[in-house]
Amino acid sequence: VYLFTDEISTASIVYTFWITVVTVIVTIAISYLLALYLRFTDNKVSKFIGTIYLLPRFIPSLVAVYAMTTIIRDSGLLNRISLLFGNNFKPGLLYNAKGIILMNIWFNIPFATMIIVSALSGIQDSVIESARDVGANQIRVFFSMILPLSIKDVMIAMTFVFMGNISSFTTP
C-alpha cells in the first residue's frame, strides 16, 4: 500500500510505465517495417540487413550501454564529428528518457523483428497473389491480408517487449 501512496514511488512507477509504452510503440513500428522489408524483398541489401539486425542480441547489454554512452554523450562521437563540420551538436540523449528509450529500442528491435518475420514468413505467397488477382492494391493487401494474419504475433512481440522493459534495470 505504501508503494502506491508515496509520491516518489508513484512518480517512478508512472515514469517507468511511460518509458515502457513509448519503447513498445516505437520498437514494434520499426520492427514491423523491418520485418516487412525482410519478408517481401529479395536483394543483397535485405540479405545483409537480415544478417546484421541480430547483432544487438550478441552484444552484452552492459557493453552496449557503455558504447552508446560514448557515442551520444555531449562530448561523444556525434559531437566530435559535428565539430568537423563546424557545428556543436549536443544530442542531449544521455541521462534522460530519450536515451533510455533509445537503448531499450536497440535491445528489443532484433527480438521483436524475429517474431514478426516469423509471422510474415508463415503467410504464403499464394494468399497475397490471390488478393492481387482479384484487384487488391498493395495497401488493400496489407490491411486485409497481411496485418490480420500477423496481428497475433505482433501482440506477442508487444507483450515480450513490454515485459522486458517494465522490469529492465540495464539502462539507468
Q: Where in this protein do the model-derived segments appear?
A:
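Short hydrophobic faces within alpha-helices
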Residues: 13, 55, 126-134
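Glycine-rich helix-loop "coupling/hinge" segments at transmembrane-helix boundaries
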Residues: 169-172
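Glycine/proline-centered hinge or cleavage motifs at structural transition points of membrane proteins
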Residues: 134-135, 148
